[in-house]
């Protein structure tokens, strides 16, 4: 079990190819535009060699840069409900869980208390940590599998870009009916079942 409210990231500046501001350095590290906007709002978010500085400060070789990622959001509208789920992996930045089949990811008007969001709200409430629901990937209600959640704004930005660039690989297992050859490739879209917007 691991929790995190504010995340600090330390960078040792060993070498620089060219003179660079802190803002440019962080952008190269995967910080989103919104991440940088949030950092600029906090005068104690950027610490360089033990001194708080602004984002336009120039870096030099040998600098030690510490960035404080503050949690400002909250998914307090999601009702905490004690529901079972399995944690596959957890660290300061992300949580990977095995979503049970039959459980939707998000609560809805017709199902406000039996979703993964409710279960995670309970999980974080029990640890006294603000809950922000940041799903990186999606799974249908009846699909079980690994779901990635970002635990802070920086990891959300980095993981979202990786997902868009298809750098996060996903493998699906499916049940099929009938006799199939030992190997082969099906190169065709998976169509929806007639009369359904979910079943394929």
Protein language model regions, located:
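RNA pseudouridine synthases
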Residues: 2-200
């Amino acid at each position: 079990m691991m929790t995190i409210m504010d995340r600090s990231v330390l960078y040792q500046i060993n070498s620089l190819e060219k003179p660079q501001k802190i803002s440019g350095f962080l952008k190269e590290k995967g910080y989103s535009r919104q991440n940088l906007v949030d950092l600029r709002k906090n005068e104690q978010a950027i610490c360089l060699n033990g001194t708080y500085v602004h984002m336009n400060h120039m870096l030099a070789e040998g600098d030690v840069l510490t960035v404080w990622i503050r949690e400002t959001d909250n998914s307090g509208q999601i009702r905490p409900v004690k529901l079972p789920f399995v944690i596959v992996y957890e660290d300061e930045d992300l949580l990977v869980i095995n979503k049970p089949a039959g459980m939707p990811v998000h609560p809805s008007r017709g199902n406000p208390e039996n979703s993964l969001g409710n279960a995670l709200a309970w999980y974080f409430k029990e640890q006294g940590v603000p809950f922000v629901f940041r799903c990186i990937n999606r799974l249908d209600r009846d699909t079980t599998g690994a779901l990635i959640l970002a635990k802070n704004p920086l990891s959300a930005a980095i993981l979202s870009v990786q997902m868009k660039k298809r750098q996060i690989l996903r493998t699906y297992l499916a049940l099929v009916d009938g006799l199939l050859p030992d190997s082969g490739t099906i190169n065709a879209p998976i169509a929806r079942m007639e009369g359904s917007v979910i079943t394929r």
